[in-house]
Structure formats: structure tokens, C-alpha cells
């Protein structure tokens, strides 16, 4: 998977410390995020066993991707109404840019 390779490639250079994904368990706007987790989380975690990848479910929350870098800097991207492939691209975009 491209996202797994992207994380391995940039983690050290950018000081990536953590990835968090916030989503709702049942809202239509979070469906693509749920699909992404179901299809790609295991591969992503296997490729990056030392990187915390946190999945946070909460009712009625807007789906969002957070990347935390060194010195507490964070970057976030809304994932509302994204497909699983769009979530993958959003993850790759966040990882390819510095906080």
C-alpha cells in the first residue's frame, strides 16, 4: 500500500510521532473512513509497528485525520464524505508535507 510506504519514508525526516483518525461509528460522512480502516489499517500498522496509529470513534463527530510531529506540532485534514481511496490520498498528502 502506498500510504504504508509513505509513512516509512517520511517518518524520520519529518519527525512524525503519531497519527489519529477521528470518526463516527454510523454517520454517512464517515463511511469512507470506516472502509479505509477495515481495508487498510492492518497493512498500515504492520508496516509501521512503532508508530502510534490511533482510531477514535465518537457519535456525531466529523471525520478528521490528525498527524502529530516533533515539538507538539499538529496538522489535521477533514475527511467528511471521503471514499477509502480519498482517505489514503489525504494521509499521503499530510505525510509528504511538514507540520
Curated annotation (Swiss-Prot):
* SUPFAM superfamilies from the UniProt entry: Thioredoxin-like
Q: Does the keyword Disulfide bond apply?
A: yes
- Tell me where in this chain the PTM N6-succinyllysine is found: 64
Where does this one sit in the cell? Mitochondrion inner membrane
Tell me what topology the record assigns in the membrane: Peripheral membrane protein
Tell me which positions the record assigns to the signal sequence. none
Keywords in alphabetical order: Acetylation, Disulfide bond, Electron transport, Membrane, Mitochondrion, Mitochondrion inner membrane, Respiratory chain, Transport
Residues modified to N6-acetyllysine: 64, 75
GO CC terms of this entry? mitochondrial inner membrane; mitochondrial membrane; mitochondrion; respiratory chain complex I
One Pfam entry for this protein is L51_S25_CI-B8
Where N-acetylalanine occurs along the chain?
2
**Which residues are connected by disulfide bridges in this protein?**
24-58
Q: Does the keyword Transmembrane helix apply?
A: no
InterPro entries xref list: NADH_Ub_cplx-1_asu_su-2 (IPR016464), Ribosomal_mL43/mS25/NADH_DH (IPR007741), Thioredoxin-like_sf (IPR036249)
The similarity annotation says: Belongs to the complex I NDUFA2 subunit family.
Query: What role is this protein assigned?
Result: Accessory subunit of the mitochondrial membrane respiratory chain NADH dehydrogenase (Complex I), that is believed not to be involved in catalysis. Complex I functions in the transfer of electrons from NADH to the respiratory chain. The immediate electron acceptor for the enzyme is believed to be ubiquinone.
User: Subunit arrangement?
Assistant: Complex I is composed of 45 different subunits.
* Stated name of the protein: NADH dehydrogenase [ubiquinone] 1 alpha subcomplex subunit 2
Query: What's the source species for this entry?
Result: Bos taurus (Bovine)
Amino acid at each position: 500500500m502506498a500510504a504504508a510506504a509513505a509513512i516509512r519514508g517520511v517518518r524520520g525526516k519529518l519527525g512524525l510521532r503519531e497519527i489519529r483518525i477521528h470518526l463516527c461509528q454510523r454517520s454517512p460522512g464517515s463511511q469512507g473512513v470506516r472502509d479505509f480502516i477495515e481495508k487498510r489499517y492492518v497493512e498500515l500498522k504492520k508496516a509501521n509497528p512503532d508508530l502510534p496509529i490511533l482510531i477514535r470513534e465518537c457519535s456525531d463527530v466529523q471525520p478528521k485525520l490528525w498527524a502529530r510531529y516533533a515539538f507538539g506540532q499538529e496538522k489535521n485534514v477533514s475527511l467528511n464524505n471521503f471514499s477509502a481511496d480519498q482517505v489514503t490520498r489525504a494521509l499521503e498528502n499530510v505525510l509528504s508535507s511538514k507540520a
